[in-house]
Structure formats: C-alpha cells, structure tokens
Amino acid sequence: MLSRVLIANRGEIALRVLRACRELGIETVAVYSQADADALHVQLAGQAVCIGPARAADSYLNQDALLTVAKATGCDGVHPGYGFLSENADFADACAAAGLTFIGPSGDAIRKAGSKSAARDLMRAAGVPVTPGSDGPVASVEEALAAAESVGYPVLLKASAGGGGRGIRRCDKPEDLSAAFAEAKAEAQACFGNDEMYLEKLVLRPRHIEFQVLADRYGNVIHLGDRDCSVQRRNQKLIEEAPARCLTPELRERMGAAAVKAAKAVGYENAGTVEFLLDPDREHFYFMEMNTRIQVEHGVTELVTGVDLVRQQLRIASGLALRIRQEDVKLQGHAIECRINAEDPVQGFRPCPGRVDFLHFPGGPGVRVDSCLYSGCELSPYYDSMAAKILAYAPTRMESIRRMRRCLEEFTLEGFPTNAELSYQILYHPEFILGECTTAFLDEHLSELLEFSRKLSESGVDA
C-alpha cells in the first residue's frame, strides 16, 4: 500500500481523497495556492505546502512545483483529483519518471482516450458504437463541409482535446460552418492548447448516460453500473442520478459491456468513466468520450453499489488486484446528486463567488454532502464555482426525489447566489419526475423554471 500521498488538487475532491487516505492509514500532503491558505483541506491534511499564487497556472497547474513538493515531503503517490492536471498525460509520465505513483491511468492511456477523434477510431475498431462523423480530424472548413454533407445536418464541431463543454459548436446548415469552425478552433486553442477539431452527427434530444469502470494492472476490468447525467446547462452537468431510470436490464447489460470494451481498448487502469449518448428510441447508443479520472458525480455510484471508488483508486495504484467481480456488482436503491454552484441562473449563470456569511447543510438518513465550505470562508473567484454536492439516497427513485427536495429546503447559504432554487424547481417538473429528461431539458424549460421561482419569491410562498 502507498504510504504517503500528495493531493494535487483543492476543494471538496481534495477532502474526499484525504479522508480515503486516512481510513487506509496513508499519510497525506496537501498543496495550496495563496488564495487557499485557509482552505479546509489545508487544515485537515497531515502536511500542507504553498505552491504559488492564486492563478491556477502558477499553482495547481505548476507541474514542477507539485513534483518538487512530492519529492521533498517523501511522498510515493500523487492523486490528481478531477480537473487541473488529472487528465494531463505529460504529468502522469512526469510522476512516473520521478519515481512517484500517479493514482490514475498511464500517460499512454490518457493520450489514447484524451484525443476525442483518436478515441473514436479506437472505439470503432473495438466494436463500441460511435456516432457517424468525420474519419479523424478535420483540418479545414472544406473538410468539415464534406464530412457534414456525408452524415447530414445538424452536426457538432468538437475539439479533439476538449472537455467541460468547451470547444464545441452546433451547425444546422452549411452556412453556419465557417464561423463555427473558427470560433471552436480558437476556443480549443485557448482552453487546451490544441486546436484540432473533428465533426460528428448531432443526436437530437439524447440522454447522457455514463458507466463507471474500474481496472487493475492484471487485466481485470469491471463496470459499476450507470449514471444519468442528462440535466445539463451548457454541456455542464447539474443533476446526476444512479441508476438511469430509462435503461432496461438488457440495454444496461449491452452498454456496460461496451464500457468494459472501451476501457480495454485504451489499456486502462484505475477508475474511469465511459460516456454515451442514448438516442430517443432508447435502442441505439453511441460512445461520446472517456474521462480518465474520478468524476465529480462518483458519489451516486458509491451510494447504490456500496463501493468506495477513491479507496479502490488507492488500492489499484498500490498494485493490488480488484477484489470485486462483475457478478458482485449490484445496484440497490436510487441516488441523486445536485451540484450547488455559486452562480446566478437569472443572469445567465454568471459566477458569483464570495464570502460565506452563514452556511447550513442538510442531514439525516440517506443524505451526503461533499463540500469544502464553512461559515466565514471565501469561495475563490480563481477556480470552479462549485460550492457543494448534495446527495440523497433512498430505496426508490421517488423516495430519493422527495429526500432531495427536503435537503434543498434545509440548505441555507448566505453571502452569494447559488443555483439551489433552480435545482429544487427541476425536482418538481413532470419530465424529471417521470425520468424523461434529455440533454435539451434545461434549454427547453429554463425560462419557465426561473419564472416559477420568481413568482414564488415575490409571493413569499415557500416552495
């Protein structure tokens, strides 16, 4: 087992990793920027070292600083969390070169999965369904036009190195392509340092279904069921649940088998997620991408399987074989997660970080809260606007929905706006209750959801 781990991240995921390490008897070293000097993960870690100014490029993305701290503090492992360097193949390689265990897949696997266009080719060869699209990258508007003509409109232009909804543009007709191509390439270059693009057919009104996978170095690969992440805004997930209500047992088995194939195709090791689009007929699904890290929403899978995914990451990275077999995985009950973001939905989801004047999280049976906030702390403007994840678990989906409603009624944060009220309204929407939400749900219903919230606020009625 690893003896001391550097947690190369911040916020709630740093806390999540820290807690798992403690329970396994692994010592922890936290890193922090000057803006995070009072952060909770800094206070709870065995050691904490400042690695630079607030700007992420000078701190949490500073590979040399992270590796220097890891070696100086006697660490033998590095956990990247999610975001920042978690899917950076060069960082994984640099850790290995420095004699440190990167708690994630190899740099080679990250590269294979990280290039979206190359990953599509790999999946196609492995027998995993992919959406119709270009054969590899499109280097010019002319190539994009030819590919779009072949598969038919509407189409998506997507960054090969993309993620987080960035570097994506929808085109409904040929006249849209030229401007969209330039915009997407520029955004991809700015966000990822790579402007390579590919094109794929847009699946209208799909569901976003993803499968959690675990793989060890001995060739054992399993999936731990599915998550429905269809409630999104700007390609960013807002509410996630497990298992997906829309899947039949037969379809779940087919998609799970495809997820395992996908992991094997890239030579995967550790925890990862294979994302699919499920079309409206609920018969055809298509590989979208593979996330080579722990996911923000991993908690809903933990609740319905009883498997501690971060603990599994640490065990696998320590060279231990998976003890869990596919037949051991049972999905029991239902879990829902609401991401609480410091943003104002009325103002176009404008980030609104600031000081937490007062904070109260919900509790009770079947409730879990993952957050780094406390009353009096500052939510920094330099990083992601997520303030907390609230999870509710119950024997049935409807009970889980009711429990989450109660959680959001209890949740109180004074100091800045959040999207909690919007999530609360979604939980009452008929489409959500019936499990019929597609990725278009929020675009189609946002105005009515916000209007209902406004009327309740003006009337003084507590929803």
Can you name each region flagged by the protein language model?
Residues 1-125, 138-146:
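ATP-binding N-terminal substructure of ATP-dependent carboxylate-amine bond-forming enzymes
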Residues 133-134:
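Conserved beta3 strand of the protein kinase N-lobe
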Residues 139-142, 152, 462:
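N-terminal non-cleavable signal-anchor helices
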Residues 2-24, 34, 48, 71-73, ...:
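ATP-dependent carboxylate activation and anion-phosphoryl transfer catalytic cores
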Residues 147-156:
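Acidic/histidine-enriched active-site and ligand-binding environments that engage anionic O-linkages
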